[in-house]
């Protein structure tokens, strides 16, 4: 009886260790779909005083769920990444990592934003840190999609 209990505990520990190892390896994996987020088509958006308005019919980089694009207007200090994770949803966040200020990319297969720096901080689409070393969440901006337009409130 003692030996079968020992076997069961040993087998359970090995199984749990295997599951943990897979999860740890996933966290540190270097996704192949990293670092290729395009800039949003310049003629597809206008910058107003307190918002950016995107004409979705003129923005093929956001045409399909799982796509993302950058908006960069340095003279207004606007640096965003827009992600369309699902057919009816969009998110807009700061495009720079809170650890070292490096550019982020959307990793579609994992539904995460990844820092393009060596440390690869990962962020959830709500801006929270999924894996550091990033010390704080990303700034998130309110978005509204209606009548073929996406409005991002700054």
Provide a role label for each language-model segment:
Residues 1-20:
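N-terminal secretory signal peptides and thylakoid transit peptides that target proteins
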Residues 109-113:
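Metal-associated gating/positioning segment near the N- to mid-region
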Residues 114, 122-152:
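Exported/periplasmic cell-wall-interacting domains
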Residues 97, 115-116:
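Short cysteine clusters
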Residues 119:
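His-Asp-centered metal-binding catalytic motifs of divalent-metal-dependent phosphohydrolases/nucleases
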Residues 13, 66-67, 101, 127, ...:
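Glycine-centered flexibility sites
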Residues 28-98, 102-107, 139-154:
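N-terminal pre-ligand scaffold of iron-sulfur
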